[in-house]
């Protein structure tokens, strides 16, 4: 399968536009009549909207919901259910066949990682976020190898609040550890973020007010009691 590294290496003396890298990679798939299988980490349904609309034109996608950073548990369950429901609705509306896979919810591992690295007091966007991105990219890469996918990647680059340059650099580093290719991206480019807002309205998708991290949420003054109450009320619609 085609590796993005040769494309990126030609841009080393400039700020890398990972949206262009992805489109060049897709061009190579098309020239070689390749339709790869991609295991795509998604942090939430909103970030997967435009991302799926774009990628399903060229590849077979499975959404991998691996987000043990989300707190509290009911909020995690709400976001997972919203993600699963969007995949079902997207498939029904478009005729796509996107799969939904949910990783184990293991928040103790995330908290331990943060405390072991002494990152609890980091500001959002700092080293704690870097460690969180790396942890989740590692999880999805490992799963991609186990399940035979050609690429692993993340929909999180759609968010204008997240550092796509950093996420892609981490993804390329993780790629070196596992026998699977990283899918570079910057999905917010080419009006991807604007399209995601339209799709959230079209599909009536819940948009959360914080990333999910308990440490960042406490810094922001998030009211966990209210979050938990609202999430619990939502989940009561799905008794199974």
Swiss-Prot record:
Pathway: tRNA modification; tRNA-queuosine biosynthesis. Catalyzes the conversion of epoxyqueuosine (oQ) to queuosine (Q), which is a hypermodified base found in the wobble positions of tRNA(Asp), tRNA(Asn), tRNA(His) and tRNA(Tyr). Keywords: 4Fe-4S, Disulfide bond, Iron, Iron-sulfur, Metal-binding, Oxidoreductase, Queuosine biosynthesis, Redox-active center, tRNA processing. This is Epoxyqueuosine reductase QueH. GO terms for biological process: queuosine biosynthetic process; tRNA modification. [4Fe-4S] cluster binds at residues 43-44, 129, 132. Its EC number is 1.17.99.6. The gene is queH. It is an enzyme of class 1 (oxidoreductase). It comes from Staphylococcus aureus (strain Mu50 / ATCC 700699).
């Amino acid at each position: 399968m085609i590796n993005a590294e040769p494309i990126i290496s030609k841009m080393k003396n400039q700020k890398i536009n990972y949206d262009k890298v992805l489109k060049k990679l897709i061009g190579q798939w098309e020239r070689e009549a390749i339709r790869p299988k991609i295991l795509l980490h998604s942090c939430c349904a909103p970030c997967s909207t435009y991302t799926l609309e774009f990628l399903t034109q060229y590849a077979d996608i499975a959404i991998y919901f691996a987000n043990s950073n989300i707190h509290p548990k009911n909020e995690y369950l709400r976001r997972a259910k919203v993600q699963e429901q969007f995949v079902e609705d997207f498939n029904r509306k478009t005729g796509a066949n996107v799969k939904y896979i949910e990783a184990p919810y293991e928040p103790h591992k995330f908290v331990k990682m943060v405390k072991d690295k002494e990152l609890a007091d980091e500001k959002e966007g700092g080293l704690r976020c870097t460690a969180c991105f790396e942890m989740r990219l590692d999880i999805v890469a490992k799963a991609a190898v186990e399940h035979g996918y050609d690429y692993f990647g993340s929909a999180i680059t759609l968010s204008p609040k997240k550092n796509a340059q950093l996420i892609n650099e981490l993804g390329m580093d993780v790629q070196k550890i596992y026998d699977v290719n990283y899918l570079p991206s910057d999905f917010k480019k080419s009006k991807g973020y604007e399209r995601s807002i339209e799709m959230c309205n079209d599909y009536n998708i819940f948009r959360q007010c914080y990333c999910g991290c308990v440490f960042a949420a406490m810094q922001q003054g998030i009211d966990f009691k209210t979050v938990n109450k609202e999430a619990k009320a939502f989940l009561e619609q799905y008794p199974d």
